[in-house]
């Protein structure tokens, strides 16, 4: 019997949904495809059934699978436009799950996951990476949670309106602190992957509910600042959270090369 897989993060939703975005959003993001070149063979990057991404129904096969499909909001997208970006990517991903309803289920709460796996379906869990638009409209936290967004991060790599990634040393903003509070009240899990150490420490001091790092590795094993320190691992554990492995080779080994890339 196959063991169930629970993957806390992937970029597939953005990659297969990119061509459905409004043109101004793609222009602002600076590329016609999620990765440069995707636009030259769009048939490989539009459907969840079969695609050239890391995750597809074809690749999953019959393995019991719970997949967090993150809507990644690029730092280049202004917060005022980020909610529209998120809505369009999530709509495409949700639509793909509905089109493949014999294989997938759009999860709206944690209690939906086990039944989906028991029925042999892929649990499609909607998440957000870099929810800058929470600073523009905090009420969207409750709205999106009701629509099935179960987890979100506050930043990507750069300094943002809520928090900062590892490119800077800035801490949580006032809006970020408010977002953390409202996410906990709504039952939306906070994802601390990409937060810098300063923001992590502030989250740890303020959080009252478990939080997770969806795709972060060990800084002791691979000394890049995107990874977690041993103390940060302990903090997440002690709060009742979990950490998902990141298969990006440069975060797995100090000796990573193109030949060892996962």
Q: What annotation goes with each model-predicted range?
A:
Residues 197, 205, 210-211, 215-237:
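Acidic, glycine-rich loop-and-beta core segments that form the ion-binding/anion-interacting portion
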Residues 5-13, 195, 213-217:
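Histidine-centered catalytic micro-motifs
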Residues 97-98, 171-186, 203-213:
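Alpha-helix-loop-beta-strand connector modules within alpha/beta enzyme cores
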Residues 191, 212-214, 244-247:
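Short, conserved beta-strand edge motifs with alternating hydrophobic and charged residues
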Residues 1-154, 159-169, 174, 223-262:
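N-terminal hydrophobic targeting/anchoring segments and the immediately downstream early-domain regions
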Residues 113, 136-141, 198-209:
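Distinct, well-ordered alpha-helical segments
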Residues 168-175, 182, 191-199, 203, ...:
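Short, contiguous, pocket-lining structural segments
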Residues 104-107, 188-195:
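Catalytic beta/alpha-barrel core
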